[in-house]
Amino acid sequence: VIKADIALHDLSLAPSWRNGSVVVGHSRITPYAHRMLESCLVVTTDRWFLVVRERQSGTAGLAAPAGEPRAPRHVDEEAFHYLYQACVLWPLDYLMVEVARVGCRLRIRAGMLGSAPVYARATNDRITVSWDSADFAALPMALDTEVVTHRLAMHTMYAARQPYSGVTMLTERASLYVEPGKANLRYPDPVAASAPRDDRDGDDDLPAFEAALRRSAAARPVGEHATVELSGGMDSATVATVLRSLGTTLASRGILLDGEVRDTQVPRRSLIVDRLGLADATVDIAAWPPDLDMAPAGAQGFYREFYLEACMALWSSARSEGRDTLFTGVGGDELFPAYAGEGMPGAAMDPGWVGESATCAEGLLTPRAREAARSLRTFDAPAGPVPMTSLIANSCRAPDMLRHGQWPVAPLGDPQLVAFCHRLPRASRRGRELMRRYLASHLGADVFPPGYSKETFAHVLPPLIARHALSLTAQLTQCALADIGLVEPRAVLALLDTVVRTQSHGATSALANFLWLERFARQTA
């Protein structure tokens, strides 16, 4: 939630606020300006820190809205320590920049929610920080081939190391230490794995589940500027329902799919919108298809929302109405895990589909890249209070949302809610039974009956790729990932042919993953 360009020798000087930024000599730290964020600069003898954090409901104003000018708060050592501890223990997301003027030493510390991570590149005498990884494309960067290989193989990975060598993502609770000539990233201690409790006859977990939902949704002062992404699924419906139960004035936005899934998605969304009284607007995925151009305008970041074009239309629509806080259903898939030995139907993804994607992805790799992809990684971030896949989703979507003026909020990724749900007995987790009961009690049992058909984007890309097959073939006569020895060009064209012939979801997923990485890699060619 900051952008910064800091010459380390400037850290020996005193900081000041100027035009929405903290200025130190010729260096500048600029918080992301948004009504849901606040910032504060606290200064004592030879030390200071800047915190940019999510605003919390019902708290007094230590900080000013991020981006607004506010004089530094000069305090003694005792008050500095007190304020520092209060910021470190902040229950919502935050980013802290801490400076010791003696020695020009700096530490950047991230909060535990990973809502909008920042990226950093340190050299002997300078550090650059940004919430938008595309900013680093302006520099002559080299690819980290080990990271890129694992991503080509579609391995789930949440780590500080990123596709550009020397660029680090500050993962949740991580700290980056920098001083002239030295840099060191430290991961936090892992969070202990959860375990379900035994079933107890007569227990009803629904009241406690609803209370945890309400606490998470009410944690931030939303006002009248909120939008919820409403796909028509249980996760986003749960978020919309709990926000309306709190009296939140709420708009909804959704992407309408094509094909058979539309026949169930549209009426289900309509029921939710009508029963919650939402100000709704939609776009059709057919009108905003994903861009398959391998030479798009503008720099590309490390991650991308595959359906960015349709999402941008929704975000722009919300922004035009003054709505700049976007509630999402991210985290819902991770609330009700299956533990070893439990047969849990209704999993988020079919294992056969996952296996097909992995096989197709590995088939693209050269022998040396395949061996690298099969090696175990030693650089992943440890387990945290927010599930890893939720953190990955946040990192993929946040930069695009911030560019469009939207601050993302994921109530279903709240650590206390996650911990509660992960300890539920099997009967409450099976088939998301507790969430289904919650929705039935507020929306009616007809909206999400047992075994309802879930909406999916699975059928969007295959026909689109088939229509653009000739153009893609022509664009892939040159391949940056092949030039650095990671993929076999003939295997890429063979996979494209497989997608055109079969429109298989697994093959399409592997090809789409390759196309995005190839587009990104061409920036460094």
Mark where each language-model region is:
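Short coil/turn segments at secondary-structure boundaries
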Residues: 161-171, 220, 226-227, 403-405, ...
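Alpha-helix initiation and N-capping motif
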Residues: 11, 76-80, 133, 145-146, ...
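Cysteine-centered catalytic environments shared across enzyme families
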Residues: 1-288, 515
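Short, conserved sequence motifs enriched in acidic/basic residues, glycine, and aromatics
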Residues: 142, 411-412, 486
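Residues that form generic nucleotide/phosphate-binding pockets
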Residues: 78, 82-86, 139, 151, ...
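ATP-dependent adenylate-handling active sites, centered on carboxylate activation for C-N bond formation
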Residues: 102-105, 112, 123, 180, ...
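Short, solvent-exposed polar/charged micro-motifs at secondary-structure junctions
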Residues: 38-39, 197, 290-295, 458-465
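PAPS-dependent sulfotransferase catalytic core
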Residues: 340, 348-352, 445-505
